[in-house]
Structure formats: C-alpha cells, structure tokens
C-alpha cells in the first residue's frame, strides 16, 4: 500500500499496487478525485480512495464443471408454422427398353410400368 501525498489532493489517499488487481479494478484506482471530497470524507482524512466492488450480477462467473451432468439437448425456440399435411399422388414411370438383337423394326413404344405412389408433403 502506497501513500499518495499530492499537493492537488486535499487529503492523503492510499492506493494499492495494480499488479494484484484485475484490469477493471486498476482503472478504478487510477481515477482519483481532485476536487474537494464530500463531508463524509472530510470527517475521515484517511479514507481510501476506492469505489465499492461491483455487484455480482456484473461480474463474469464461469459455470461450474460437473462431469456427472448429462448434456442438455438444445431446443429450437423459433416458432414454426404448422402446415396441414396433404397427401399427394405422384406417378412414377419406369421405362424399360429391351435391347433385343433383331432385324425387325419395332414401331411400338417401349414398355412402361406406371405405379401409383402416395406420399405426404409437409
């Protein structure tokens, strides 16, 4: 702890070395008031020039690592539009060409098998 005795400060202020403080707290120590302190400070000339510690809600606290904990699946919270399921009928055409070695000219169409398939589209 170093005593800061400056001609611009009306009372001596104590400052802790910055090596043991976090960067956020170092900035708090570097800004010292150079105006006349409030009446509560005038009654106690050895008051430390420090700001109160930030509340815990402002501090970053890492989560506890629990190895027994199972993974929680992520849930998509984006609202999806529910659509009505409508059955559709699609015709699947299976074209089979029979490669027969023939000298005859075949003028008919190739064999086709048509199957009816019913699927649901979402």
Curated annotation (Swiss-Prot):
Q: Which residues are glycosylated?
A: 74, 84, 86, 89, 95, 102, 118
According to the record, the segments passing through the membrane are none
A Pfam family reported for this protein in Swiss-Prot or TrEMBL: Casein_kappa
Q: Which parts of the sequence are annotated with region: Disordered?
A: 99-122
Expressed in which tissues: Mammary gland specific. Secreted in milk.
| Any one GO BP annotation for this protein | lactation
Mark out the compositionally biased spans (Polar residues). 110-122
Tagged with keyword Manganese = no
Q: Which pairs of positions does the record mark as disulfide bonds? A: none
The cellular location(s) given in this protein's UniProt record come to: Secreted
Residues modified as Phosphoserine are: 102, 119
Which InterPro entries does this UniProt record tie to the protein?
Casein_kappa
Cleavage, annotated site positions: 58-59
Gene Ontology cellular component?
extracellular space
Does the keyword Metal-binding feature in the UniProt annotation? no
Annotated function: Kappa-casein stabilizes micelle formation, preventing casein precipitation in milk.
What does the similarity note say? Belongs to the kappa-casein family.
State the protein's name: Kappa-casein
What is the organism of origin for this protein? Odocoileus hemionus
């Amino acid at each position: 702890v170093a005593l800061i005795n400056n001609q611009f400060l009306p009372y001596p202020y104590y400052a802790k070395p910055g090596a043991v403080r976090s960067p956020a707290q170092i900035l708090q120590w570097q800004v010292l008031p150079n105006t006349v302190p409030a009446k509560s400070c005038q009654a106690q000339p050895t008051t430390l020039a420090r700001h109160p510690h930030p509340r815990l809600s402002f501090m970053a606290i890492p989560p506890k690592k629990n190895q027994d904990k199972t993974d929680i699946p992520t849930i998509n919270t984006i609202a999806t539009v529910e659509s009505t399921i409508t059955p559709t009928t699609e015709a699947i055409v299976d074209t089979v060409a029979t490669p027969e070695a023939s000298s005859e000219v075949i003028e008919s169409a190739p064999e086709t098998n048509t199957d009816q398939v019913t699927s649901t589209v979402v």
